Amino acid sequence: MAVDKFNIMRESNFKYSVAIRTVGKAGDKYIQELQSLHNQTVKPEHIYVHLAHGFERPKEQVGMEEYIDTPKGLVHQRAAANMVEEEYVLIIDDDVYFPEDAVEKMYNALQKYNADGIAPDTFPSQSMSFFSKAGAYLTNTVKGRKNDEWAIRIQRSGAFSFNSNPEKGAIYPTESAAGTAVFMKTKVWKAIHYEHEVWIDKYPAGTFGEDQLMYQKIIENGFKLLMWYDSGVLHLDANTNKASQKSYDKIYYRAMSQYLTWYRCIYDLPRNTSADKLKNQLAYVYRFLLSCSVRLVYSILQFSPRFLTAHIKGNIDARKFVKSEEYISLPHFVLSPKE
């Protein structure tokens, strides 16, 4: 499924708008993003900037942006893309650079492969060092796969596996992606009702895998997602949404995220049989025990059990939460036509 840029016909008869989430602190990287959007071969109809409530409008402006005061939270600000009325929407963070023909090429890829959304590969896991890959597996069972013409696959444990050797410039189907940027059909975006997941925003920004949940909601509701390798789209990484909590709190909330994402996106799906659920549980137990062993070693080295206990307590509290009235009352992850 490798893409040849010379074999994709130019199609420019489409309209889209951009939805950016920001707290207004990306600085020069935000300017680079805006300028790259203004330089697109197909211009956006609107550039909506969903600025978190209480934060000042960035001094850096290009001129076409429309600022929308939005409740603070990664999900609240992303779900605000619902206001887009054009046929397509480009949903992005505030620190992404796009080559001038990037949006046009993403549109053309959707037509060629009959897909609903496409995300550029802005976090190339396949390029990690050996030690980084080993660490990713030990802490989170993230692992590489041979080139099977898929990009990201989600394992039963909730962790992802990545294509270790994608073809240069390839476009492959995927089950997840970095949340940095995605171009998709607006009707599909609205169909998944991402606003139903605003419960995530009660957790500190940067501790919850809300992007994985977003993409899996697209997949589990029957839509097709692509990943584009070597696109030239760059995550400039302004570091504005990293977790502020350190040590204990950070580990605790990430452990909660790990369990809740697994439960909502993997375990508690209507298509699962009893056998599927058992396999999912066993996979998660393996992931949990492996990550506990790593945190045990770290706790020993730091002469403190807190790093291990934070991970365990996060999982325990997450398990309690999915049995609570608050969680049970959430709308279904896989939506019925009436929802």
Question: Where do the protein language model's features map onto the residues?
Answer:
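A recurrent flexible, glycine/aromatic-enriched loop bordering the glycosyltransferase active site
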Residues: 74, 150-184, 206-207
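Acidic donor-binding segment of Leloir-type glycosyltransferases
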Residues: 34-69
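Short, well-formed alpha-helical segments that are part of the catalytic scaffolds
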Residues: 20-39
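Active-site-adjacent helix/loop segment of glycosyltransferases
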Residues: 220, 224-306
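Conserved donor NDP-sugar-binding/catalytic core segment of glycosyltransferases
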Residues: 101-146
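Acidic donor-binding loop at a coil-to-helix junction in glycosyltransferase catalytic cores
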Residues: 177-179, 200-216
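Glycine-rich, basic loop-to-helix element that forms the pyrophosphate-binding segment
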Residues: 69-85
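Short aromatic/hydrophobic "clamp" motif used to bind/position activated sugar donors
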Residues: 89
